[in-house]
Amino acid sequence: MDTLCARWARLEPHVTVVGPQDDLPRPAALLFHGCGGLRGHLPRYAEVARARGWRAYIVDSYAPRGWSRQFAMATVCTGLLLRGWERAGDVLAAIDGVSRRSDVDVSTLLLGGWSHGGWGIMEALSADRDRPGALGLADAATVPLEGVQATFLAYPYVGVAALNRMRPWRHCPKTLAMIAARDHLTTVRNAERVLAMARQCGAEVETWVADGTHSFDEPMTAPPMRFDDALSRDALNRFGHLLDDVAPAAPVHRRRRAD
C-alpha cells in the first residue's frame, strides 16, 4: 500500500505543468483525465488556466503504472481496474504533492476531472479518510482539503459502478458540473440527482446540461461519442469563468502548509 509521498513520487515525473514562468505562489488547477487517458482537450483547459495567472497540473494516472491507452480502454473503461476510489488516491497524492511547491498558493486549488477523473474526485471528497487503508493509501487522512476551493466535473462518471455516488461529500467546494444530454453512461436525471446530493452538504453547485454526447469536448473521440467544437469552446469559457470566480484578483503570497 502506498503512502502519499510514494504515490506522488510515481506520479510527479509524468505530470505536465502549464503556467506563468515565475516562482510566485499562484492558484493551481489539478486536472485528471478520463478512462481513455491523456487526450488533446486537457491542454486546452490548462492554457485557459495559464492565461488567468493559474498554474495547471495535468496528472497522468497511466504512465506511472505502465499502462497504454489500449490497455486502459480494455480494463479501466470497462471497470476491471482502477475504480474511482482507487483513482482518488492519485487525487489526494497530487493535492499533497502540489501543495508542497513554493510556487503554489495552497489556499486556492481547483480539482478538474473528466469522466473517470471526476469519479475519482468525488470519491476523494466523500471518503472516510480516517479508515485504515482508505483509497489505497496508508495516510490518506493527512491531506488537508481546506485549500480545495472548487471542482470542475466534466460529464463525471456516476453510473452503476460508482457505488458511492450518493455518499455525502465531506468537503464541499464550489462546483461546476457539465452534464451531457446524450451521455450513454448516465441519464441526465441520474447525474442531477447525484449533484443535488452535493448541494445538500453545502456545496454551491452549478450544472450545465450541454446538448452533446459524453466527451463532447474531446477531439478524435470515438462513437457513440462525438466531438462538438461549439460546445467545447463553451465549456472552456465556463471553466475560465469558474477560475475567475475562485481567484478574481492577482494571487498574493500565503503561508505554505508545513511538511
What is each model feature region?
Residues 31-36, 156, 180-181:
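Glycine-rich His-Gly loop
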